[in-house]
Design a protein with these regions (language model features):
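Acidic (Asp/Glu-rich) sequence patches and key acidic residues
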Residues: 1-150
């Protein structure tokens, strides 16, 4: 079931609402993020373990020096889900931003109820909020109300 959240809305996970992510004072736990993704490997894949991630690791010497540090520091920074074999890419990307202490999302497809439920479960595990544009909280009730409007 597709949920009506406009594609220009940014879904993120943070420990507090925000207008500007630079103003967030309560940061997410990177260790708990890694723990959660490792527990849920049936759905998520670390970018490092994807074909692209393995290629980058195996060819790190061919990458310009100025870009190597960013690649090496991004270990466990992105989790991927729902590989589209026809298109050749993952359609759901979660990015942990250590500097901001938040997780942002990228969807290459319509957001469905199952996506919101996965994100809400992750947010709850991290003792955090699932947010639209940093302001609107998505909880179980929000999802149910969206479903009723369909």
């Amino acid at each position: 079931m597709n949920i009506k959240i406009k594609s220009n809305k940014n879904l993120a996970i943070a420990r507090e609402k925000y207008n500007n992510p630079l103003s967030i004072s309560k940061k997410l736990s990177f260790e708990k993020w890694v723990e959660y993704i490792n527990i849920h490997q049936e759905y998520f894949t670390w970018e490092d373990d994807s074909a692209d991630g393995i290629y980058r690791k195996n060819n790190i010497d061919k990458i310009p020096e100025w870009a190597r540090e960013g690649i090496l520091n991004s270990q466990k920074g992105k989790a991927l889900a729902e590989f589209n074999k026809k298109k050749g890419w993952y359609e759901v990307v979660l990015s942990f931003h250590k500097d901001l202490g938040i997780i942002t999302t990228t969807f290459q497809k319509k957001i469905e109820k199952k996506h919101l439920l996965h994100l809400l479960e992750l947010a709850n595990y991290l003792d955090a909020l699932l947010l639209i544009d940093g302001k609107t909280v998505i909880d179980q009730q929000f999802i149910e109300e969206l479903e009723e409007k369909q």
